[in-house]
Amino acid sequence: RPRGEPDRRDHRQPDGTRRRKRGASLDPAGYDAGKKTAGRKRHVLVDTLGLLLSVFVHPADIQDRDGAIPLLRQARRLFPFIERIFADGAYRGEKTANAAAATGAWKLEIVQRCDLRRFVVLPKRWIVERTLAWISRNRRLARDFERHAHTVAAFVRLAMIRLMLRRLAATP
């Protein structure tokens, strides 16, 4: 064969377009019809500095207000001293309010969007969005590579540990 000519037996796709086969995910990955995305949703509970307190991962076909209930139960066990929780409008509803009331003396406040048709920073919601952006900078969390939801939750925790360690080690 002449030099520079591809081998006829090599049927692979060119670099950059090659796809690896993935085994079937053991945990179900649903489809969120509202956002038109498949995969999983990550619910995070953060403090006022944006540091992770708790994380819960579930298939995307479960509504946000239903996915918040296990997160609230988990957080109540770990952090009984929390008094107030600020949440997105997706967590509005009786189920979430009842779950927050059942866990103790928590006050659940839904942060509403303003009626203006332009971008407005909502301070309480911005804390969580900023934390999710910090977490998504990690390669393993930029896309859904994992087969188990608990593995995704573990990588979210690791990403936050890495971020906090960098901040602690930073010289003033």
Each predicted region: which residue ranges?
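Basic, amphipathic alpha-helical segments enriched in Lys/Arg and hydrophobic/aromatic residues
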Residues: A97-N98, T103-A105, I110, R117-P172
